[in-house]
């Protein structure tokens, strides 16, 4: 079993990153490495979509792929691999011959570049969680979706700090916009949330 590297949550080993065969959260190295491969496939998809129009299928795969890789969401290696295969097929149908991006390049980049690209990547993953829940309720925002592709493409490009910093700021702005979208989706679907008493008894 290959070793892993993962440092996207605040509970990483020694506050530097989980290595070896199992993370602090229990994620196995094979799953962590498959999630890196999935991320590389998403970058390939983003590049392919840059030369074509995005579609409902590519949007769904982008959201599912990013959501699948956030902390403690999916530790099923078979599911992660299946999703990678679907993303690869979508990208191949759009732009044959494009290779998946090797995410190790991000982890091995100079510290400042690694930090900025990580902020973008982890921000996109978190935003995708909001966007996917809004998507499930039938709410989609074109500006948000377009930024997922833009952000993932930039991760696969050679960029300096001056070019990455504005994207980090934009990631934050898009995240707020997505939170507004999810709030709208929830309130229009379920009504305004109100304080409600609930029983605290333990039931079988």
Language-model segments: residues:
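Metallocofactor- and cofactor-centric catalytic cores in central/energy metabolism, strongly enriched
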Residues: 1-204
